[in-house]
Amino acid sequence: KDIWGIGLKNEKKLLKVGIKSGFDFIRLPDNWVKRNMSIIGLKLKKELEGIPTLDIVEENNNKKSIATTRSFEAEISSLDDLIERITTFAVVASKKLRTQNSECNMISVYIRSNPFKENNEKYHFSLTGALPFSTNSSIEISKFAIELLKNIYHKGKSYKKAGIILMGLTPESIHQVSFFEKDTKKHKKLMESIDNIDNKYGLYKVRLASQDQKRIWKMNRQNLSRNYTTNIEEVLLVS
């Protein structure tokens, strides 16, 4: 119950075998966790053990939800820095949505403290919101995610991890037009153009205005091929 992200279904499984705390959880065999809680549960266990998994984690659970989460290299207390991270997570998750030709109508955002820091207050804040219309636009999803973040951010507290979860996934082919959406067609064409650029030149060649250009560049440099530009100024900006 003291671990964020376990979920009610897995919590019941753990309670049945006498697991009641994070300490109990990390003592379970890896193969049991993977068999009963999937690879997602195993990644959570490794994280609690202090063993790093992927820097940015994208998860797709039977097309019911898509999550992008990350533990930061250092604690963050600035709202602006958190906005930059959440925006990047939204972009990554949105691209995954488009790849599987889906849209979402609900978003959840969370931020939490460092669970391994001794003598430190443990806290996490999360908020889920329903979208006024289904979308897979990076622009729309990041905008709504930032609003959720602003509602759970507590000034003066430090955060070590954050994440965004896209839920209420539906096929893009059955999109229902809403009174509240104005730029769907324009966004669809823009997202198609961005995805084409990403597929041709590599990820993060086009970024949103609220993303940090130097950080994106640093994240992607180790994966560059000789065909990629080496000029940071060539990264396109979408505002």
Task: Give each language-model segment a name.
Residues 1-2, 196:
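Hydrophobic/aromatic side chains embedded in well-ordered alpha-helices
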Residues 2, 10-156:
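DNA-contacting surface of Y-family translesion DNA polymerases
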Residues 131-239:
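Acidic, metal-coordinating catalytic segment for phosphate/diphosphate chemistry
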